[in-house]
């Protein structure tokens, strides 16, 4: 059984990490769970698993991030790439440049989320460097 996350996977505008325990406590029993505006997936990742769970989001960058995490080899590569990313304005600026490489897109999403001022940094919205 996978371990429950102890921190949000990615800072996301409107993220429910702190509210997730309260939200989960007030959920009725269910077999199907749908996250229509998935974002960082804080509630989905913290709630007990059920028969069917659906994650959806219009933002292709965050959807790509979760696709990369789903693949064990890519997940390990993403973790390593993030560990080796220096906390620098140049990296932050580079994170807004387009790339076709799925792993690099996921890393850049993480960089924008971690280094951007405000949680909107994970999106393509331009934010300040923190």
Model-derived regions: residue spans:
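Class I S-adenosyl-L-methionine-dependent methyltransferase module
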Residues: 49-130
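S-adenosyl-L-methionine
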Residues: 1-38, 42-43, 48
């Amino acid at each position: 059984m996978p371990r429950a996350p102890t921190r949000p996977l990615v800072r996301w505008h409107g993220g429910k990490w702190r509210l997730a325990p309260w939200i989960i406590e007030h959920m009725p029993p269910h077999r199907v769970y749908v996250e229509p505006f998935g974002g960082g997936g804080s509630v989905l990742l913290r709630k007990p698993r059920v028969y069917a769970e659906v994650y959806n989001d219009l933002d292709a960058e965050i959807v790509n991030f979760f696709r990369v995490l789903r693949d064990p080899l890519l997940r390990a590569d993403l973790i390593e790439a993030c560990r080796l990313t220096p906390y620098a304005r140049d990296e932050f600026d580079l994170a807004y440049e387009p790339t076709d490489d799925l792993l690099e897109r996921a890393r850049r999403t993480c960089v924008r989320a971690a280094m951007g001022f405000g949680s909107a940094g994970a999106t393509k919205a331009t934010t300040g460097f923190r």
